Amino acid sequence: TDGTSEEMKQFGGRLKVIEHTENRGVSAARNRGILHAKGKYIAFLDSDDLWVKGKLKIQVAFLDDNPHYPLCYTDEIWIRRGKRVNPMKKHAKYSGWIFEKCLPLCIISPSSAMMRKNLFSKVGLFDEALPVCEDYDFWLRVSVRFPIFFINKKLIIKRGGHPDQLSSRSWGNDRYRVIALEKLLSEPCVGQEERESVLKEMEKKCQVLSKGFFKRGNEFEGRYYREIMRRYGIEI
């Protein structure tokens, strides 16, 4: 609906365009592309973002030279309402075993990442049941299993701040992060130390959500997040 398929026609047969007949969400679109891909590496470009020239070349070279890393990602230039802004401290980037850093919020932009296609056979595809935070869910599944490398170069431009963005339209994204955290607790690769970290983060998010819903008069949802805390032995 954003005119992408029309733009692709200018490239002739050099690019293969795969379309859904109806909007099934970003996860379904990514998953279909992954399943149709023939190459050994996968990269995404969301509609609001731009790749800087040379991005793919730099990442391919890194993954070729570092077979023990399944994924690398880059730094970003942020544009909000047409003006360049500096990311906040909470969006800082890290290399290595970054699972703990990925728990509060999503620090990897999908458009900045490149990964080996065989990674999806190890961690699964994007969760199509999540309308937002599907990337948060995916990065957690990756980072709890593998180290991730940060390329300290600004190789994508993230444009945001307009009202039609999906992330701008979804109130309380932590609701979906809690779902992702609950899912993670059932993963056999999650050890006791990681489990404790997940529960601490879940407690923070459930406390905020519960208080927020009670404040807005939604007692049903407020009690729901208290019940999640009780289920995992978290004191209220």
Spell out what each predicted region is.
Residues 1-6, 22, 46:
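A conserved acidic beta->alpha catalytic loop
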Residues 7, 20-37, 58:
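Glycine-rich, basic loop-to-helix element that forms the pyrophosphate-binding segment
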Residues 35, 92-180:
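Conserved nucleotide-sugar donor-binding catalytic segment
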Residues 38, 52-53, 116:
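GHKL-family ATP-binding catalytic core of two-component histidine kinases
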Residues 42:
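Short aromatic/hydrophobic "clamp" motif used to bind/position activated sugar donors
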